[in-house]
Amino acid sequence: MDEMVLSTQKWLNKKYSNVTGFDKVPENGRTGWPTIYGLIEGLQVELG
């Protein structure tokens, strides 16, 4: 488990959980596709 990855996962879920269509990221501290998809979805929200 990576503490920085876990911190990012928690941040993603806190910031974007109220956005329609955002899939919650598992908070396990592991890198992987769900985390990458969460980062992409967050970026898309920010870019409009």
Regions found by a protein language model. Give the residues of each.
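Cell-envelope/ECM-targeting effectors and their regulatory/trafficking segments
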Residues: 1-48
